[in-house]
Regions:
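A short acidic, often aromatic-flanked loop/helix-cap motif at beta-alpha or helix-coil junctions
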Residues: 45-46, 153-156, 169
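Beta-strand-rich binding/interaction modules
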Residues: 135-153
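Ser/Thr- (and often Asn-) enriched beta-sheet segments in non-cytosolic proteins
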Residues: 103, 135-139, 156, 161-163
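A conserved amphipathic helix/loop scaffold
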Residues: 128-129, 155
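C-terminal beta-strand-rich structural cap/linker in extracellular carbohydrate-active enzymes
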Residues: 158-174
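Loop/helix patches that line or flank the sugar-binding groove of alpha-linked glycan CAZymes
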Residues: 1-125, 131-136
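Short, surface-exposed secondary-structure junctions/capping segments
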Residues: 49-50, 151-152, 164
């Protein structure tokens, strides 16, 4: 929801994990664990290659619960589908795109939440992110038309206060 071009490193969309203790290949400088092969399915080598495991250039996450593209696509509540929702919302709302303006509404040092307004000549969208494990509030008088997206609970807007559940995020059309 920030200005600029969004990006995902391969595997982010399915929640691929950092694989510990992988041998650095070609000067990976400790980042090799982030560069393991894509995990397509639960077949041999996660569908990446039919080669014997010892022939793989970089080893894979061998955990039985490793996320795969196949499993994520089949689960409507998966991270993959959550990211698809976010992409669709960004594409549908010009204020969230690269040319949308940004104005910070609440951004206090060592405090949550982070709240900012994304706007253009067509719309205004309030973005609120609260990674804290507790509910937080800030002063704000907002006339919300619609919650475009919420994760972890919806903020409430009453009496000049915005109250945000712990571990939540939301996009609110004003």
């Amino acid at each position: 929801s920030m200005p600029g071009a969004p990006f995902l490193y391969y595997g982010d969309e399915i929640g691929m994990r950092y694989v510990e203790n992988l041998h650095s290949v070609e000067g990976g400088y400790g980042r090799t664990g982030s560069r393991s092969p894509m995990q397509w399915d639960h077949s041999t080598n996660a569908g990446f290659s039919a080669a014997p495991k010892e022939k793989l250039y970089v080893k894979q996450d061998e955990a039985t619960d490793r996320p795969t593209v196949e499993a994520q696509m089949a689960d409507p509540d998966s991270l993959y589908h959550e990211i698809r929702k976010l992409i669709d919302i960004r594409q549908a709302h010009s204020a969230l795109q690269s040319r949308g303006e940004i104005e910070f509404v609440y951004a206090e040092e060592k405090q949550y939440p982070l709240a900012y307004l994304r706007s253009d000549d067509k719309e205004k969208i309030l973005v609120i992110i609260n990674p804290a494990d507790r509910e937080v509030s800030f002063d704000g008088d907002c006339a919300v038309k619609e919650a475009l997206y919420t994760f972890g609970g919806e903020a409430t807007f009453a009496g000049g206060k915005v109250t945000v559940p712990g571990g939540s995020a939301g996009f609110y059309l004003l």
